[in-house]
């Protein structure tokens, strides 16, 4: 059985409130400078995150449950064995509505095409971000094995 002293709290917070709060042995995130794996007693850290998947391994066992969370960027702060992820939006894989995510992808692709035709750089950038968010949600949903 896992030693509870080697687990730390992982919280994911959005403007809408707490999305996730559990104890974990490892949290994997994608920072702007690459992948990071954080474990118990990691050095204090504050770093920006990109649109990506957060993975939280719930115990130290090899076959431990892994929770998958889609985030739309944000920050991770780790200190005193508490990892806090602050994101504009976040969704656990089990809560993702795949039909809504696919519809968002289609809307973003349509806006992207229109922006390219009109040479509208501002709309193009926003459509690219919307597409990355939708693709991330779909990817996280599929990672869970649905």
Swiss-Prot record:
Keywords tagged on the record: ATP synthesis, Cell membrane, CF(1), Hydrogen ion transport, Ion transport, Membrane, Transport
Places the protein is found: Cell membrane
Gene Ontology CC terms, in alphabetical order: plasma membrane; proton-transporting ATP synthase complex
Claim: Iron is one of the keywords in the record: no
InterPro entries named among the record's database cross-references: ATP_F1_dsu/esu_C_sf (IPR036794), ATP_synth_F1_dsu/esu (IPR001469), ATP_synth_F1_dsu/esu_N (IPR020546), ATP_synth_F1_esu_C (IPR020547), ATPsynth_dsu/esu_N (IPR036771)
Primary localization: membrane
Single GO MF descriptor: proton-transporting ATP synthase activity, rotational mechanism
Membrane topology: Peripheral membrane protein
Gene3D superfamilies for this protein: ATP synthase delta/epsilon subunit, C-terminal domain, F0F1 ATP synthase delta/epsilon subunit, N-terminal
HAMAP family: ATP_synth_epsil_bac
Role summary: Produces ATP from ADP in the presence of a proton gradient across the membrane.
Family: Belongs to the ATPase epsilon chain family.
Subunit structure: F-type ATPases have 2 components, CF(1) - the catalytic core - and CF(0) - the membrane proton channel. CF(1) has five subunits: alpha(3), beta(3), gamma(1), delta(1), epsilon(1). CF(0) has three main subunits: a, b and c.
NCBIfam families: ATP_synt_epsi, PRK00571.1-3
Protein name: ATP synthase epsilon chain
Species annotation: Lactobacillus helveticus (strain DPC 4571)
Native organism taxonomy: Bacteria, Bacillati, Bacillota, Bacilli, Lactobacillales
Gene coding for it: atpC
């Amino acid at each position: 059985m896992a030693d509870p002293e080697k687990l730390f709290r992982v919280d994911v917070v959005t403007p809408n409130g707490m999305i996730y709060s559990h104890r974990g042995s490892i949290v994997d995130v994608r920072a702007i400078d690459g992948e990071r794996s954080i474990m118990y007693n990691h050095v204090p850290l504050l770093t920006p995150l990109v649109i990506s998947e957060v993975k939280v391994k719930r115990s130290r066992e090899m076959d431990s449950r892994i929770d998958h969370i889609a985030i739309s960027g944000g920050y991770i702060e780790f200190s005193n064995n508490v990892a806090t992820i602050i994101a504009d939006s976040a969704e656990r894989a089990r809560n993702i509505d795949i039909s809504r995510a696919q519809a968002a992808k289609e809307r973003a692709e349509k806006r992207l095409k229109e922006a390219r035709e009109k040479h509208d750089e501002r709309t193009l950038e926003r459509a690219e971000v919307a597409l990355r968010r939708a693709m991330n949600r779909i990817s996280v949903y599929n990672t869970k094995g649905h």
